[in-house]
Amino acid sequence: CYNETMSDPLQGDPLDADVTPHDSTISPGATGPGVTTPYLDSLNEAQRAAVEALDGPVLVLAGAGTGKTRVLTTRLAHLLHQGRARPYQILAVTFTNKAAREMRDRVESQIGGAVEGLWLGTFHALGARILRRHAEVVGLRTDFTILDTDDQIRLLKQHLQAENIDEKRWPARALSGLIQRWKDKGLTPEKVSAGNAGDFANGRAVALYADYQERLQTLNAADFGDLLLHCLTVFTEAPD
């Protein structure tokens, strides 16, 4: 499992590291209006316009290799440099740990110092951090374990055996894929419609999904799909 080994791609700490406004610092470079901004010098006119538009949302549409990541990271640095936001007020999401690390490095290079408290990482890493704070909303404790794919399949195999379902005919890996697709769509067992239920184990997939979720809760565990699905539940049921 990933409970102890999986790290936030930017903080370098376990995913359950708690980041609060009190941890949010920028050091040692000076920030605020009037401070020089040499990091803007490498941008072209269109890139600079996107970075300096701080009073509202900006949509950047550009092809590969045109500097979208540079614009995003420089915009983050500019928000901090101009004192328009504290690190803990910024959320930046990427798809890979490598991209997240590179973005953090670029921002710190442009700011001229370490940035602590910035919410920057992959969807799953940030989801895990949010869940550590609000685990009780989904029936977990804050020290819940994050299962990897092998752990998940092992647990499903045990469940199929307990239900006397032929695992050779109905593989646990296939059930795992089905459950993850439902979770990717934001579907809890209660929300899976008859049309989406599939024919796994002669129509028993939804019941197996529900039992699997109950088992995870008993074990105080979550799989990768839960890191996003549970966040959706948290945002819906506890918006404050």
Predicted regions mapped to residue ranges:
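Pre-Walker A adenine-sensing motif
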Residues: 44-52
